[in-house]
Amino acid sequence: AYLFGGVNIRWSCDPSMLKEKDDTPPKADFHFPGGLKDYLAASLDGEFQVTREVFAGKSEKQGGHGSLEWAVTWYGGDGFLSSYCNTIPTHEGGTHEAGFRNVLTRGLKAYAELTGNKRASIVNSEDVMISAAGMLSVFIREPEFVGQTKDRLATVEAIRIVENAIRDPFDHWLAANPQEATKLLDWVVARADERVRRRQEKE
């Protein structure tokens, strides 16, 4: 339901088929009007989040090829990125996830440079994604996957598609929310400082 915002999926099951300790309800409605943004917000309900707003959006292309939807926020837990290509779950990531990491990292570093935050020079994609909770869904004509299970997207064009779609919206989101952007940047820089400190301790 969350891959198709606005769609209402109604589930029902004969109660006699459910086991005694099964949490599966006999009836349920799955409806996320805001798509990935609503689903991500619901899944993180009650969790500490660095920014008040989830960064989310859509890019729709005529014919569907190159269309995508995304939602990401940063929180106090371990980062995760749930990605899909043509509604197929890509559990092992791939080129679309690479584009997502690239554009978020470059956007934050560009904002840091714009605001004179020199501490962000050490930030890399690991620091940006280590506490990011994200969802990404892309639609690509004739996608290429690694292996038969389609767990990893290999279409090189997906990197450019994702980067081009998200670059400007992310830049605008950061610029329109300077207090939130500063909090996020400080949070990511702190993750980078931790990474550098751990590396130095090992050396």
Regions found by a protein language model. Give the residues of each.
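GHKL-family ATPase ATP-binding module
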Residues: A1-E203
